Amino acid sequence: VLFLTSCHAAESVNALSESVSAPLPKTLIAVYMVGGNLEDDAKPRNGIPDEQEMEGPSLKGAGTDDLKEMVAAYQTLSSVQKEALDIHVAFGGARKAGWKGTKYADMACLVQDSQDQYFGNDHCYQQQIENNNMSSSESLAAFLKFLKPSLSQAERKALIFWDHGLSYLGVGQDSTAPSSDDFITLTEMKSAFSASGVHFDLMAFDACLMASLEVARVIYPYARYMLASEELEPGHGWYYTDVLTLFAQNAHLDMAALGKKLVDSYLDTPQHNRSKNKYKTLSLLDLEQVSPLIAALTGLTAQINFQKFEPLLQAVENSQHFGKEPQSDISYSIDLKDWLQNLKQKQPEASVAAEQALSRLQSLVVYARHDDSKPNANGVSIYSLNKNMKPQYGLEQAVSEPWLNFAGTFVSTGSHDQEKPVISTENFSLQQNAAKLCSYQGRQGHCLKIQDNLGIREAEQVFALKADSRYLFLIGSEVLHPLEQNSQYFAPVWNGEWLLLCDGNCQTGLSLFPPAYFEALTTQGHRIYSSEALLNDEKVVFYLEMDANNRVVSQWAIPYSVSQDGRVILSRTQLNIAAGDSLQFFYQVYDTQAQVLVWKKGSQLRFGQTPVWDFAQINASKAYFFQAQDYQGNTSLSPLYEVQTN
């Protein structure tokens, strides 16, 4: 065998070897992981700690899964890449033996701690703090101060908050805290950062609803970029094998470029889509642009004319909403760009100021993406101007005092309305075949006129089952389509078909007609509906996605709780119904004599087989009517419209 070499080849090999072994710039990644019920109440989700039910260690938990993903990523890296990553995780805040208090661990410790698949029972931790409330400002400040020596050695610095998020109401719910409703408020977050004197290149939130201007307003002095979601997140959150790998493989990228890769990973990679759930949004923000945007919003609020409340209301209601819970009638936030564009159209006298704010907003949003269920999620949200959320939205939460004053005037103006909407019924008839029908986009239906002194918040067609001559069980709704004519709406004829949920075969198994109230349209033209239910006795908002052929293409449930002070705490978890689950829906029931609407629990359906969806004719007495509601909640109903059974 003859080997031929050349000096040039040897030089190339040596150069390549030097390139491969050359040290990479140091990157610090810190994770503040408040385990909460995402870690200690994994399955079954019932409010009881898993280890209490099992009377022993539980290897399940969303935090555990993500720590395992970090370990898996780290073990695939080269020695040079490992040397360049300085990873510190503060984890705890959950009702598990290994997660009580707080433990600080680097990657070497996490690898060692993972050997028995149970985190929190080793002796390798950098620090271990007993009886620590991770939802406190002091706990966060302590971790930030611990990081300071390492931060000084790193060229890129990232901090990730992990847990439930409530936008301007805070992040991180420690389930071992004296109050299980405790979160790190924005004020506490600011205090912790101010006391520690640290600064990050990227501050990220693997938590729901945190891509709000209110959050950005608090953290902008302490980070250059922010990565967060406007909407709720899937229960599994981020896929940390991919997250750490992206940091390691892109050691020379600045945070703006790396942040874009993280956004794309969240929307595109199969591991981030493994639950098949909807409502995925993620955005990268340049925090140096926060102050100019807030200044532009201050100028805008001075130009808004509250004498024209109806267009103001329409601008809000037509905007993309986030963090909705129907029974409490709340939403946390709306998309800021969507609202500004709607406002510009609805109130021309404020259009110049709105355009200036839009220009500033464009500079703030470096990169933003969403799935097809949130077509108008553009990267940054702001308080929704929902009157039921206003008691929790004060100066500590607001982006500025002028904005808070604007929000207060908006809520006050709409809340003083005492007049009900008026629904014109000249096109109604109690017999379907005698109705005066019109058409809209090729569909036959009713053309209605609905008016209100301060504007309509929502107008919908409501479908009902007649329990008797007095009570109507509302099983669903569709939004009424506004026509070009002033105050005119269109409603299609209902043929009496509706959703059917069955335990296995719909011909032989137990079944029920679930309530499904229209929520939104996807970019594919699919309809999303929501309802309230108990899934395995836990309160959830239940979502359905239906295609144009009325087939259910996806379903998911988001657990929530209501705190003692009235906060609706929406979980990051998204659940799917399966065999073995029990499901019990809440129906809105209308008392036609008392003319009141109340919520009542329906029958419980326990699935012995795989749940099956159908869309079929209802073999019961049924009717529909039209409903209009203003901002204050004053509601008008049309006459009841009988559906004739074929």
Question: Model features per residue range: what roles?
Answer:
Residues 4-6:
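C-terminal motif of bacterial Sec signal peptides marking the signal peptidase cleavage site
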Residues 28-33, 86-91, 157-161, 201-205, ...:
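Structural recognition of the beta-strand scaffold that forms the well-ordered cores
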Residues 13-153, 618:
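N-terminal extension/subdomain marker
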Residues 8-11:
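Bacterial signal peptide processing site
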Residues 39-41, 60-74, 163-167, 175-177, ...:
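Residue-level signal for functionally critical sites in structured catalytic/ligand-binding pockets
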Residues 145, 149-151, 165-205, 210-646:
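Terminal, contiguous helix-loop blocks that mediate binding/assembly
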